[in-house]
Curated annotation (Swiss-Prot):
Database matches in Pfam families: Proteasome (PF00227)
GO cellular component: HslUV protease complex; proteasome core complex
Gene Ontology terms, MF aspect: metal ion binding; threonine-type endopeptidase activity
Amino acids binding Na(+): 158, 161, 164
Keywords: Allosteric enzyme, Cytoplasm, Hydrolase, Metal-binding, Protease, Sodium, Threonine protease
The keyword Metal-binding belongs to this UniProt entry's keyword annotation: yes
E.C. code: 3.4.25.2
NCBIfam families: ATP_dep_HslV, PRK05456.1
Name listed for the protein in its UniProt record: ATP-dependent protease subunit HslV
UniProt-listed InterPro entries: ATP-dep_Prtase_HsIV_su, Ntn_hydrolases_N, Proteasome_sua/b, Proteasome_suB-type
Subunit composition and interactions: A double ring-shaped homohexamer of HslV is capped on each side by a ring-shaped HslU homohexamer. The assembly of the HslU/HslV complex is dependent on binding of ATP.
Activity regulation statement: Allosterically activated by HslU binding.
Protein localization: Cytoplasm
Length: 173
């Protein structure tokens, strides 16, 4: 359970996430880093779901990026295919948002690789709260950057979602 949100605005893409890890109904850690840079710092990924599963998937995605020389869509599709067909990976419970400077995608274990129609994508238990906040901020006249919109969306989600906190990591490309 977490909040990961991605926003594209004015040629920049930002992904942010909270840092809370829960076990059942208890907070176990508040400083988990769920957003990371990959492939020569040109790709950002954020994950929601089981932490260990997400780390495995992030490592697999990084290998796909290296294999496909940083091609985001090809790497994401190859990861989704392997995730869905490999028996051991099928049981992994996590979702990822992956982004570079021009595109961003949702990747899931059911084989989904989705490019959103709007400039916002969010996952996790607080994802709908963050997505709503980010869309509202994108639709209003303001001078906020993609990174600032992500920060505000995470604050709102953290205020509402009990499985998200206010320890945020935000990366931008």
């Amino acid at each position: 359970m977490t909040t990961i949100v991605c926003v594209r605005k004015d040629g920049k893409v930002a992904i942010g996430g909270d840092g809370q890890a829960t076990l059942g109904n208890c907070v176990e850690k508040g400083t988990v880093r769920k957003v990371r840079r990959l492939y020569k710092d040109k790709v950002i990924t954020g994950f929601a779901g089981s932490t260990a599963d997400a780390f495995i998937l992030r490592d697999l995605f990084e290998k796909k990026l290296e294999l496909h020389q940083g091609h985001l869509v090809k790497s994401a599709v190859e990861l989704a295919k392997e995730w869905r067909t490999e028996r051991a990976l099928r049981k992994l419970e996590a979702m990822m948002i992956v982004a570079n400077e021009s595109e961003f995608l949702l990747v899931s274990g059911s084989g989904d690789v989705i490019e959103p129609e709007q400039d916002v994508l969010a996952i996790g238990s607080g994802g709908n709260f963050a997505k709503s906040a980010a869309l509202a901020l994108l639709r209003t006249e303001n001078n906020l950057t993609a990174k600032q919109i992500v920060a505000e969306a995470l604050k709102i989600a953290g205020d509402i979602d009990i499985y998200s906190n206010h320890n945020h990591v935000i990366e931008e490309v």
